[in-house]
C-alpha cells in the first residue's frame, strides 16, 4: 500500500511503471493503477450523453468541446424503439469487422482531453471501474474481469483499424510529381537522414501515448449487451440491469445498507464480503461510533455508554422492572446515544451521492424506522441465528481462550441476554416487514442481500417507488422484492426434493402379465413372479440386486419359483410391484403375494393391515438383518391409497439368509407349518419368527402353486382365465399342492444347518469392512403422478444391539459439527436407490 501511495505522490509516469525493473510487483494484471493506465493501448472510455453531443453539433456551440466527439449521433425517440444503426454478428465479439461502428466512436490521445469533471454529461471509465459496474449488476468476478478486458481490447482493435484506414487515405492523397530535380532529391535525402536520427533519439526518451475513446452512452450500452451475450449473459434482464449499475457508478443514485442483529450473528463478516462483492468500500460500524463517543464522554458521565449492549440493563436500578425489561431498556438507551451521530453521517453520504454500508447491534427496529423515514436511500436487513446451539458455538471463536466456559467467555455468560435482544429484534422486524435473514449460510445470505438491493434499486430508478410505505408504516416494496429473491436461491433440501422427483418413476398399470428381473450378480437367484387374479391381470416387477456376495452358491438358489394363481372376484389389487434388493449377501427370496379385501369389511391377514372403504393399498415390507444380534427385524407398513396399485418392497441387507415371503408372511430360517382345511379349500399359513407368530388366512381363496422354469428356459405362455372349478374337483389339486409344499419345507430344513454355520462365520468377520454399508440416512419422497408413495425405513445401526430403526429429522439449520458459514449451510447425506426408484 505504501508503494502505491509513493508512486501516486511522486508522480511516477506510466512509462516508468512498465519499464522500471526496480518495481517488479507493481506491473501485474491485478494492480488497479496498471489497469487504468496502460501505455500504447486503450486506457479510458469516455461516455458522452446524447444531449451534450447535440449541443456540440450545433453551428455555434456556447462552449468548446472538452473531448473529441464521434462523427455521428444516434438519436433515440421517447418510446425507445429506434433501431440501432448497425448490427453485430451473433456470438462474435470482434467489433472491428463492423464498419459502421467507426462513425460512432472517436479515438484520441489523452493529451487532447481537457478537464471534464465539471460536466456531468461526460463520465470516464477505466478497466477497474467497468469491472466494479459488472460485479454490482450480478456478474461473477471472473466474468466481470474478462468482459471488461474484452471491451477494451475490442475498442483497441477498432482504433488500430481506424488508423490503418487513415494511413491508406493519406497515402492515396499524396501526389508525386516528376518535376523534382535530382539536386533537390539529394538535399532532401541528407536532411531526412539527420531528422530521422533526431526523431529516433526523441522516441527513446518520450513516453508512449495513452489512447482514449469517446462514445455515446446508448451505443456503449449496446456494445456491452453484445459482449455480455457472448459470455452467456444473454437474458434481457442483464441488458436492463447494466444501465442501472452505471448510474450508481456515476453517482446519480446512491443507497445506504443497514445490517442489524445481535452479537455473533455474522454482521461484520457479511458486511466485508458484501462491500467487496458490490465494489463499495465505505463501511462503518456502530461499535466504532460508540468507541469515538467514549473518547469524549467519561464513564462517570454516561455509564450506559461504557457498557456492552447485552448487560447495559444492569446499570438500571429500577426494582419494578423485570430482568427482560431491564435488558431491553438498557439496550435502547445506548442506541439513542448512537442515533444522532449516525444520522449525521448518513446525511453527508446522501448529499455526495455515495453509497454506504452500516452494520451493528445498535440498529434496532425503532432506530431503523427513524432512519428510513428521514433518509429514503436506506435499505435495512436483520441478521439472526435461529438455532441457539449454533449461535452459542460461534462465541467460542470470539473468546480469548477458545472456550464456551462462562467464566472465561463473556458472551457465553450473557448468552441469555443476547437471545432476549434477538427475539426483540425479530418481533419488531415482523411487525414492520423488515427482511430477516437466517445467517446459517454465508453464501446464500450474501446472494440474497445483493439480489434484493439491486432489485429494489432498479424499481426505484425505473418506477420511482419508495422502499418505505408511510401509510402502512411497513417496508412493503422491500419485503416483496426480498421474497422474490429468496425463492430464487434454493436450499439444499429443496434441491434434494427436486432430484428425488426427477429420479423416481411411478409404476403404471397394464392389462397384461409381465415379469421383469434385473440381476446384477452371477450368484443371485433368478426370480420370476407371475400373478393371475380372477378378475384382472396385474403387473409384477421384480428387481433383484445382489452385490458383494461373500459366500458360495450352496447358500442360495435352493428355492424354486412359485406361480400364484388367485381366483377371487373380490380381489381389486391389479398391480403388484415387488422390489428385492440384496446387498452384501447371497439370498433367495420367493414372493407369493395374494391380498384379499372384502370391500373393507375384513382384511386378508392380521399383520397390522389397515383396510378402508377402498380395496387398494400400498404395502412396504422391509426385511433388515442385525449383524450383532443374528436376528431379523420385520417392519411392515401399510397405507391406503385411491389407485389400483399395490407396491410391495422387500429389502434385505447385510445378511446371508434364505427368506420366503408367502401371503405377506416373512419366513426367516424357520420351518413353515402348513395346515390345510379340506372342507373349505382354504390354506392357513403359520410362520414362526423368533418369539413372534403371524397367522394369515385367505377366505374363499384358492391358491394354485406351480413351478416356473428358471431364467434362460422358455417360460410358458399365459393361459386364458377360466372360471374357478367346483370344490369337489379341487381336492386332488389341494393334495398335490400340500405335497409340493412339504417337499419345499424339507429342502429348507436340510439347508438350515448349513445356513446357520455360514451365519456364524459371517458374524465373526470384521465389522469395519461393512461399516459404510450399514449406516445410511433416512429418506422420503413422493413417487410418480398416480399418488403412490414409497416409504423407506432406515437401516439398523451395527453399533447398537436393538432392532429399532433410526431416523434423521431434517432441520433448517446445520446439524453437523462443521462451521455453519460453509457453502450451502446444510449437510445432507443423500442416497438414491436406483433399483427401487427406477432409472
From Swiss-Prot:
Keywords, sorted A to Z: Coiled coil
Region (Disordered): 504-611, 627-646, 682-839
Compositionally biased intervals (Low complexity): 509-611, 689-704, 713-753
Biased composition (Basic and acidic residues): 636-646, 765-776
Keyword Coiled coil found: yes
Chain intervals with Acidic residues compositional bias: 809-823
Coiled-coil segments on the chain, per record: 726-764
InterPro entries per the UniProt record, alphabetical: P-loop_NTPase
The name this protein goes by in its record: Uncharacterized protein DDB_G0273453/DDB_G0273565
Amino acid at each position: 500500500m505504501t508503494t502505491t501511495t509513493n508512486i501516486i505522490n511522486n508522480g511516477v509516469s506510466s512509462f516508468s511503471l512498465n519499464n522500471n525493473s526496480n518495481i517488479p510487483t507493481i506491473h501485474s494484471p491485478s494492480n488497479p493503477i496498471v489497469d487504468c493506465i496502460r501505455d500504447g493501448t486503450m486506457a479510458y472510455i469516455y461516455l458522452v450523453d446524447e444531449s451534450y453531443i447535440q449541443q456540440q453539433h450545433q453551428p455555434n456551440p456556447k462552449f468548446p468541446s472538452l473531448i473529441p466527439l464521434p462523427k455521428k449521433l444516434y438519436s433515440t425517440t421517447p418510446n425507445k424503439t429506434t433501431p440501432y444503426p448497425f448490427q453485430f454478428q451473433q456470438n462474435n465479439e470482434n467489433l472491428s469487422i463492423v464498419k459502421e461502428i467507426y462513425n460512432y466512436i472517436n479515438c484520441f490521445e489523452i493529451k487532447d482531453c481537457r478537464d471534464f469533471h465539471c460536466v456531468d454529461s461526460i463520465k470516464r471509465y477505466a478497466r477497474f471501474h467497468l469491472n466494479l459496474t459488472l460485479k454490482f449488476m450480478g456478474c461473477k468476478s471472473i466474468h466481470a474481469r474478462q468482459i471488461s478486458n474484452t471491451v477494451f481490447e475490442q475498442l483497441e482493435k477498432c482504433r488500430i483499424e481506424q488508423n490503418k484506414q487513415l494511413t491508406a487515405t493519406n497515402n492515396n492523397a499524396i501526389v508525386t510529381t516528376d518535376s523534382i530535380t535530382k539536386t533537390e532529391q539529394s538535399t532532401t535525402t541528407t536532411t531526412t537522414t539527420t531528422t530521422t536520427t533526431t526523431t529516433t533519439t526523441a522516441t527513446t526518451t518520450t513516453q508512449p501515448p495513452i489512447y482514449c475513446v469517446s462514445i455515446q452512452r446508448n451505443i456503449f450500452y449496446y456494445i456491452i449487451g453484445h459482449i455480455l451475450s457472448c459470455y452467456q449473459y444473454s437474458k434481457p434482464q442483464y441488458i436492463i440491469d447494466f444501465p442501472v449499475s452505471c448510474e450508481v457508478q456515476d453517482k446519480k443514485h446512491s443507497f445506504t445498507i443497514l445490517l442489524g442483529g445481535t452479537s455473533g450473528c455474522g454482521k461484520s463478516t457479511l458486511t466485508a464480503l458484501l462491500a467487496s462483492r458490490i465494489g463499495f468500500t465505505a463501511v462503518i460500524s456502530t461499535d466504532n461510533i460508540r468507541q469515538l463517543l467514549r473518547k469524549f464522554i467519561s464513564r462517570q458521565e454516561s455509564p450506559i455508554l461504557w457498557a456492552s449492549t447485552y448487560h447495559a440493563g444492569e446499570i438500571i436500578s429500577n426494582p419494578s422492572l423485570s430482568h427482560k425489561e431491564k435488558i431491553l431498556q438498557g439496550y435502547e438507551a445506548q442506541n439513542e446515544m448512537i442515533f444522532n451521530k449516525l444520522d449525521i453521517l448518513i446525511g453527508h453520504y446522501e448529499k455526495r451521492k455515495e453509497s454506504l454500508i452500516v452494520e451493528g447491534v445498535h440498529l434496532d427496529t425503532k432506530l431503523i424506522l427513524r432512519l428510513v423515514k428521514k433518509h429514503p436511500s436506506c435499505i435495512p436487513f436483520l441478521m439472526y441465528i435461529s438455532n441457539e446451539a449454533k449461535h452459542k458455538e460461534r462465541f467460542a471463536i470470539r473468546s480469548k481462550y477458545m472456550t464456551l466456559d462462562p467464566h472465561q467467555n463473556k458472551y457465553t455468560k450473557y448468552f441469555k441476554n443476547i437471545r432476549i435482544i434477538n427475539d426483540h429484534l425479530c418481533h419488531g422486524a415482523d411487525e414492520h416487514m423488515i427482511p430477516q435473514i437466517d445467517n446459517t449460510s454465508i453464501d446464500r445470505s450474501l446472494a440474497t442481500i445483493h439480489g434484493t438491493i439491486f432489485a429494489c434499486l432498479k424499481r426505484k430508478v425505473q418506477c420511482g417507488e419508495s422502499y418505505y410505505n408511510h401509510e402502512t408504516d411497513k417496508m412493503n416494496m422491500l419485503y416483496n422484492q426480498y421474497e422474490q429473491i429468496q425463492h430464487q436461491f434454493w436450499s439444499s433440501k429443496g434441491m434434494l426434493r427436486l432430484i428425488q422427483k426427477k429420479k423416481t418413476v411411478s409404476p403404471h398399470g397394464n392389462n397384461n402379465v409381465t415379469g421383469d428381473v434385473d440381476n446384477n450378480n452371477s450368484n443371485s437367484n433368478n426370480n420370476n413372479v407371475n400373478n393371475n387374479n380372477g378378475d384382472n391381470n396385474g403387473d409384477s416387477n421384480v428387481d433383484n440386486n445382489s452385490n458383494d456376495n461373500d459366500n458360495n452358491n450352496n447358500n442360495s438358489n435352493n428355492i424354486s419359483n412359485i406361480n400364484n394363481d388367485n381366483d377371487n372376484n373380490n380381489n381389486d389389487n391389479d398391480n403388484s410391484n415387488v422390489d428385492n434388493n440384496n446387498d452384501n449377501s447371497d439370498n433367495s427370496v420367493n414372493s407369493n403375494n395374494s391380498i384379499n379385501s372384502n370391500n373393507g369389511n375384513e382384511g386378508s391377514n392380521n399383520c397390522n393391515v389397515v383396510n378402508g372403504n377402498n380395496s387398494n393399498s400400498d404395502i412396504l415390507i422391509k426385511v433388515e438383518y442385525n449383524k450383532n444380534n443374528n436376528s431379523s427385524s420385520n417392519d411392515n407398513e401399510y397405507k391406503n391409497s385411491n389407485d389400483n396399485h399395490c407396491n410391495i418392497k422387500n429389502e434385505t441387507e447385510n445378511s446371508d439368509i434364505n427368506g420366503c415371503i408367502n401371503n405377506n408372511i416373512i419366513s426367516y430360517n424357520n420351518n413353515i407349518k402348513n395346515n390345510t382345511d379340506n372342507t373349505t379349500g382354504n390354506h392357513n399359513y403359520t410362520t414362526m419368527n423368533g418369539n413372534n407368530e403371524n397367522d394369515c388366512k385367505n377366505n374363499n381363496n384358492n391358491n394354485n402353486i406351480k413351478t416356473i422354469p428358471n431364467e434362460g428356459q422358455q417360460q410358458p405362455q399365459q393361459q386364458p382365465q377360466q372360471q374357478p372349478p367346483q370344490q369337489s374337483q379341487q381336492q386332488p389339486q389341494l393334495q398335490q399342492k400340500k405335497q409340493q409344499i412339504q417337499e419345499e419345507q424339507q429342502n429348507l430344513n436340510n439347508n438350515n444347518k448349513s445356513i446357520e454355520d455360514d451365519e456364524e462365520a459371517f458374524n465373526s468377520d470384521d465389522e469395519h469392512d461393512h461399516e459404510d454399508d450399514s449406516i445410511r440416512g433416512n429418506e422420503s419422497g413422493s413417487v410418480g403422478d398416480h399418488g403412490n408413495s414409497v416409504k423407506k425405513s432406515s437401516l439398523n445401526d451395527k453399533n447398537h444391539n436393538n432392532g429399532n430403526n433410526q431416523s434423521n429429522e431434517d432441520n433448517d439449520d446445520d446439524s453437523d459439527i462443521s462451521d455453519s458459514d460453509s457453502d450451502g449451510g446444510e449437510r445432507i447425506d443423500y442416497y438414491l436407490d436406483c433399483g427401487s426408484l427406477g432409472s
